[in-house]
Amino acid sequence: MNRKLTLWGLWIFSVSLFYLLCPPASAQTSPKREFRAVWIATVANIDWPSAKGLPTVRQQDEFINLLDFHRRTGMNAAIVQVRPATDAFYFSAQEMWSEWLTGKQGLMPEPYYDPLQFMIAETHRRGMEFHAWINPYRAQFEGDSLRVHPEHITRRKPEWFVTYGKSKVFNPGIPEVRQYITDIVADIVRRYDVDAIHFDDYFYPYQIQGQVFNDSATYRQYGKSFAKIDDWRRDNVNRLVEAISLQIRHIKPYVKFGISPFGVWRNRSQDPRGSATQGGQTCYDHLYADIRLWLEKGWIDYVAPQAYFSIEFDKVPYKTLVDWWADNSFGRHVYVGHAPYKIAPDGNDPHWAKPTQIPEQVRYNRRKNGKVHGSIYFSSKSLVRNPNGVADSLRTNFYKHTALLPLMPWKKGSPPPPPSGLEVLPSKKGALLRWNPPPKLTATENTAKYHAIYRVKANEPFDLNNPAQMIALTGTEGFFLDDTFPADGEYRYAVTALSRMHHESTAVYSHAIRLRAPGAWTDFVITLINTYRQAPKNGKKQ
């Protein structure tokens, strides 16, 4: 046992040493704009909450700790699963509270709070986007029918569902089903300040050998104009995606719509437009999700292909897959999905044991000449676990410098007015920045939503295009505590405002200031700020 522990300790030491000595080239070429996100899964309590039925304060503390960890790692967006299986992590008049939140389906949190409202506020406060992750078709997860509430939609509308394997899913061919799901999405967009609606890869279910998806009667009723049931199924999903896209744009045109499909659209052996891969199941042929069409039609704003394969995997090589998506995005954004959950010394693919696997994937993304716009990691707990030091590598190298999110030129927007009145007060806790945020504008998409903080030594010029000078993104509050500067010296700061769509204003600049130990007044101000941030508002914890 001691020998095993010693060998394990040596392995951990070797991995840590690798990242300490890793050349900083990637950090030096870090782009100013890059999407950096993490999936936070709630189904089966994969990432959050850590268990069913936790007290409200414990749930909130856990989520805040996750956000703080991922922001320190360099993330600028969180993709949180708010509807894992036709249930809700928010107040809904249509669907039940999730059992993975409260321990029992239909039971509200106690003490009461709205988790979605809380998560959005905390995410925005940290200068990060919040993408509401929804599973459109999954209704029951792996045979949990005994725990289903009597008022659950599967009990009220049993004719809408198909049992397949251990799960129950909506029948996509029924028009009322498509309308129901569209209404669910519209309700979230209308009532919550989400930055995006996000679907994952679950459309028609992954096929199980020897089992039939029993929708033949629905096909006979609604699919008469289609000679093949496969084409009809694809059309059903197309109709849903188009309807949701139109609904989002009608309610809040600035809200994005993104989808994270399985990595392979089609193999080239099936379609000359497909990738040079040998995927066992594909989006188009098995899940009936024609993601390439949705990009071509402009129905979605970004695609996040789940490229959960190593660079060396012969059947679906990572680089081959990324090349295909980069060349078939039709001008929309590509955020590549990475698989830190696969990192293990004894996994099925030995190449995942290499500490360089995900770092090399990120490097490759950045070499795609602007055709790949960022990365998403599945999932939160894998980054927190930090296998092979992957989170350390992101924090200290690839994401060492803060990044703004990429612009979407097809969406309306312009820079907000700049902030004003920037002051910097020294303190033993750091440098306290205070400024006046710009006024709100009539056009919501152009109102300041975030602020970017820049810092240089007093004798250096500002270059706001240099990501090394940007030290933080924060929310709309007009203050920031910088505790990252060297212990002594003179510095200057700049602050810009960013619109909801991340258009950046001109900057307001500070005078040079020598950072020394503070006076009692500055520490008092910092204490007041911290108290303000933690205080209940309107009698409820935010």
Which residues does each PLM region occupy?
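Beta-strand-rich modules
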Residues: 482-504
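Aromatic- and acidic-residue-enriched segments that line the glycan-binding/catalytic groove
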Residues: 88-103, 138-164, 201-224, 269-280
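Active-site neighborhood of glycoside hydrolase catalytic domains
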Residues: 176, 180-184, 190-199, 203-277, ...
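Active-site-adjacent "subsite" loops/lids of carbohydrate-active enzymes
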Residues: 41-61, 132, 137-191, 285-289
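Substrate-binding cleft of secreted/luminal carbohydrate-active enzymes
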Residues: 288-292, 296-314, 330-410
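Solvent-exposed loop/turn segments flanking beta-strands in beta-repeat/beta-sandwich domains
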Residues: 438-465, 490
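Catalytic domains of carbohydrate-active enzymes, especially glycoside hydrolases
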Residues: 61-87
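Pro/Thr/Ser/Gly-rich low-complexity, intrinsically disordered linker/stalk tracts
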Residues: 389-390, 394-445, 502-533
